[in-house]
């Protein structure tokens, strides 16, 4: 079974889904339990139970990150992505705390300089935001660009990181 824990933050509700091997999904959305259950069945073929055996460390690290006490997350994760998306998200983990890169710069980081839109798609489908810090990816002109949990949350995370340096 997949464990689920949900908790409220200043930026909204955060949910963590995890199996024994690691965290599979982090969500800032107020997703219904039915929607999360469907995601789990489609991606892992399992249902959800509320629990803390597999989510405690991730929750602790995320709370410390969001309070400015931690600059990176290192709890175990289960990467449910295509090879290309894995390359994009792993490259983004190398972007230092408090810094940003453009979609084009990330495309160059993975050796695919023309794959700018594909980098955007990988970020849009990132099941583990914060762990894979897609909020650090901005448009080439310096504007924020999109973010699955809203531009306000993206700005909040970037401001948090710049204040905690």
What spans do the regions from the language model cover?
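Terminal helix-turn-helix DNA-binding modules in bacterial transcription factors
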Residues: 122-127
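Helix-turn-helix DNA-binding helix
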Residues: 112, 116-119
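Basic nucleic-acid-binding alpha-helical/helix-turn surface characteristic of O6-alkylguanine DNA
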Residues: 1-112, 160, 164-165
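Short Lys/Arg-enriched helix C-cap and helix-to-coil transition segments
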Residues: 130-137
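Active-site phosphate/pyrophosphate- and oxyanion-stabilizing loops and adjacent acidic/basic residues
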Residues: 38, 120, 155
């Amino acid at each position: 079974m997949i464990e689920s824990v949900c908790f409220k933050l200043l930026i909204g509700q955060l949910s963590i889904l995890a199996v024994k091997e690691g965290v599979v999904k982090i969500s800032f959305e107020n997703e219904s339990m039915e929607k999360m259950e469907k995601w789990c069945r489609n991606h892992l073929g399992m249902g959800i139970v509320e629990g803390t055996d597999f989510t405690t460390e991730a929750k602790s690290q995320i709370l410390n990150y969001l309070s400015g006490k931690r600059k990176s997350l290192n709890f175990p994760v289960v990467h449910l992505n295509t090879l290309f998306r894995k390359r994009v998200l792993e490259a983004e983990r190398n972007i230092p705390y408090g810094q940003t890169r453009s979609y084009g710069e990330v495309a160059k980081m993975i050796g695919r300089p023309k794959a700018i839109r594909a980098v955007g798609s990988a970020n849009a489908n990132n099941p583990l935001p914060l762990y894979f810090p897609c909020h650090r990816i901005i448009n080439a002109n310096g504007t924020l660009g999109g973010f699955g949990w809203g531009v306000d949350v993206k700005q909040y995370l970037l401001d948090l990181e710049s204040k905690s340096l």
